């Protein structure tokens, strides 16, 4: 748990019965401790696995039928990111590198055990391996915003990777006619489209705006 961006060892559990003997608390403490021990084990094991060397391993992980592997997706992200970087006047090389390694954390046991940490752990792995802070943040924030009220990336490199990822997903799924309907949106395409609009629409906030590249 975090309080004001600082870690604390406090956690909350909701129980239906009064825990007079502390057994419910003890049981949940053991569960949390076991999960944290798992996380520590996987972190120690995964953090030194070279992200750049892991790029080719993405060829063995399918993304979606008709859209290739995660390696194929990262190559599309490189091209899209390069186009967007021209609009934002930022380093194309750094954008292409972040796009190449941004999905490698999906290969880790840590993300396999805690899938909700995808992207976040990629950022931590990149930081542990000495990548610069712009690239680390871009990888960490690639899936943002995640919904209404979610934090929105503001740094140019983060915007570039996040926007490229959303554009690729939208174009790919619509190209396969996997469109949302009035009752179903299994791939959260509406959320992704709204996320793109947050980057490209005028806003009173001090946020870098990305202009959609014409070839996108």
Residue spans for each PLM region:
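Positively charged, low-complexity/disordered segments
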Residues: 1-3, 203-206, 210-216
